[in-house]
């Protein structure tokens, strides 16, 4: 949690520091994005997050956790049922 806090603080500093020098907000935000970021590269980064894994002859999507508590994956539930038998 502390890491997320410091990342947020550093991003705020990275945006507000150029503003104090008279730059526009749009230019400051664009300065945080790499110059070689193309729509194709951005699409590949986004699509890479949604991987499909093959497990027990079924295709299961791995949930992407945006919060601290993630929902259990389907095969974990199945493994728990097998263990309890």
Curated annotation (Swiss-Prot):
Residues 23-61, 76-85 form a propeptide. Its main location: secreted. GO terms for cellular component: extracellular region. Expressed by the venom duct. Keywords: Cleavage on pair of basic residues, Disulfide bond, G-protein coupled receptor impairing toxin, Neurotoxin, Secreted, Signal, Toxin. Residues 1-22 form the signal peptide. Disulfide bonds join 65-70. Acts as an agonist of neurotensin receptors. It binds to human neurotensin type 1 receptor (NTSR1), rat neurotensin types 1 and 2 receptors (NTSR1/NTSR2) and mouse neurotensin type 3 receptor (SORT1). The cysteine framework is C-C. Belongs to the conotoxin C superfamily. This is Contulakin-Lt2. It comes from Conus litteratus (Lettered cone).
